[in-house]
Amino acid sequence: MGNWVKALNFHQYYSVDVVNGPGTRCVLFVSGCVHECRGCYNKSTWRLDSGKPFTQQDEDKIIADLQDELIPRQGLTLSGGDPLHPQNLSAVRHLLERVRAECLGKNVWMWTGYKLDELTVDQQQVVELINVLVDGKFVQELKDPALIWRGSSNQVIHYLR
């Protein structure tokens, strides 16, 4: 196991999900978020050390689930917490590189509190590996239950590739 494994904790993994992005998907909720948005429905994921360590076995399970032909998945969703938290970047990038190499045709959606035009170089390198980014902090005053895949109207869905 590499050091990157110790760099990421996660709260929940769903091997089959139909809520967090289009189609049937795998969803990983990572730990660690600096935004601490008022009204967040995932407050338990804010601390980096919350949840449990993301291991090689967890990563292998995601790859196997994405390759599963009995329950075809359209792709992977990364949420949290925040997948683009600086301490999550190495492990998230490693996972996404494997998805790109081993799970052809699968798309990747990611939710982050960071704005696309404010990302660091390291965050941009991770975003280059995904298809869709939903960016922006959740703003309680802009909450709109009618929105699809967004909690508040300030958040933007970026179809990157």
Residue ranges and their predicted role:
Residues 1-29, 38, 42-49:
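N-terminal [4Fe-4S]-dependent radical SAM core
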Residues 47-63, 85-127, 132:
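Canonical radical SAM enzyme core domain
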Residues 77, 131-134:
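Residues embedded in well-ordered beta-strands within globular domains across many folds
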Residues 81, 113-115, 138:
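Active-site beta-loop-alpha junctions enriched in small/polar residues
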Residues 86-100, 143-161:
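P-loop/Walker A phosphate-binding loop and immediately adjacent motor/lid segment at beta-alpha junctions
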